[in-house]
């Protein structure tokens, strides 16, 4: 298991042109925080957001919207956890300097029923802007028709689909 790099070393390395070390630190933090999210704890991930974070989820589903600020994003993330969605990270790419970095995360998310059958699966990307290790803005892009079908499945099975956490 990778140990987290010292933040000061990461900044100095990035300033010296060692962007790979900065990228490694960001990838490590994202994986750690997503693992905590799946365990039901969104707080470590939320701690990496600026207070006025901007999150976009396109489409015409109950998940879609423009969310501004940690509280709005926190409600969305808590709902994600409450519904039981799981997220598999395939790749995390990070480019740029600590004060202006771009992150691209390629993932598959899915929901299984009580018998372990997959009832929803979708592949997508997250594009994010970061500054000094904090997420400033991000957008999730995946098949919006599959997300709408997830809404229908949840409603048909009596799962609370209210967007509020």
Where are the predicted features?
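Short beta-strand edge/turn micro-motifs at domain boundaries
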Residues: 2-6, 123-152
